């Protein structure tokens, strides 16, 4: 597709396209190529199953290529701020691309086994991917989603603080980084986690149902609700523990509560 054809298809002017002002939405189309050197604020290419490659020197604030099943790689020259590549066959994200990204969503990318070295990113969702390890220097500010990443066995020690963390259904993940502070919600349901960091802090909800947790360290602090239902290896709670919201213990093996336990919400036994 040439620039002229792109302008006609999307009803935008060549001037706007050349000046980087054109909003381009080609989702669900049969487009199989795009012109090189595109500079656009937003480029939607959802479910363009005939598209086999992205143009060279593509510069976009937001790029959505989710469902582009014929795409297997990204150009090294790609410059993008928000990248959505859910349900694609992409196996690797270029390292230079990661330096610019504020947000990456790679949900259900079954060929994505690793991501390159990255220091800090706002949002990273790799749920349903076959990712085996995360960069040792990784820092995520807002959200880290790893739901169902069954090949993941550990999280980097550099992950000290994150707004929201979801590692539910990570069957081979046994522990969390030491001194972890999750500002809002922490989800570990149906994961392989068997122990919590001694100084874990969660600002809001802690969701840990259907795990093999055996103990809750006395220094763990949770700001909101706590769901420990179906934790069949958990026999006790810390003495003097304070739960500021709902406490779910249904179908756990806790038969006796600590004498000085404080629950400020509903208690479900």
Regions found by a protein language model. Give the residues of each.
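Short amphipathic alpha-helical segments
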Residues: 56, 76, 98, 157, ...
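Canonical leucine-rich repeat
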Residues: 34, 51-54, 71-74, 93, ...
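Short alpha-helical interface patches
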Residues: 137, 158, 260-261
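Concave beta-strand-loop units of leucine-rich repeat
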Residues: 22-30, 39-50, 59-70, 79-90, ...
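N-terminal capping/linker segments that flank leucine-rich repeat
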Residues: 1-33, 41
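Short, surface-exposed loop and linker segments with low hydrophobicity and enrichment for Pro/Ser/Thr
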Residues: 15-19, 97, 179
């Amino acid at each position: 597709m040439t620039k002229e054809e792109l302008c006609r298809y999307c009803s935008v002017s060549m001037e706007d396209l050349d000046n980087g002002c054109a909003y381009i939405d080609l989702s669900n189309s049969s487009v199989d190529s795009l012109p090189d050197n595109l500079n656009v604020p937003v480029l939607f290419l959802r479910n363009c199953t005939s598209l086999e490659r992205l143009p060279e020197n593509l510069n976009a604030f937001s790029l959505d290529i989710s469902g582009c099943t014929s795409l297997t790689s990204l150009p090294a020259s790609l410059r993008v701020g928000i990248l959505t590549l859910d349900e694609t066959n992409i196996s690797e994200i270029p390292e230079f691309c990661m330096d610019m990204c504020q947000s990456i969503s790679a949900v259900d990318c079954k060929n994505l086994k690793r991501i390159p070295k990255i220091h800090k990113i706002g949002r990273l969702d790799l749920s349903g991917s076959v990712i085996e390890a995360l960069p040792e220097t990784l820092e995520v500010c807002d959200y880290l989603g790893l739901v169902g990443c069954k090949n993941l066995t550990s999280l980097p020690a550099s992950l000290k603080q994150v707004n929201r963390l979801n590692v539910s259904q990570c069957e081979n993940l046994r522990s969390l980084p030491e001194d972890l502070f999750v500002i809002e919600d922490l989800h570990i349901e149906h994961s392989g986690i068997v122990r919590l960091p001694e100084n874990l802090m969660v600002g809001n909800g802690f969701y840990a149902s259907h795990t093999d947790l055996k103990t809750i360290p006395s220094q763990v602090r949770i700001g909101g609700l706590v769901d420990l239902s179906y934790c069949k290896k958990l026999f006790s709670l810390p003495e003097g523990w304070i739960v500021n919201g709902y406490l779910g213990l249904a179908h756990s093996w806790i038969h006796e509560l600590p004498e000085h336990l404080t629950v400020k919400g509903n208690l479900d036994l």
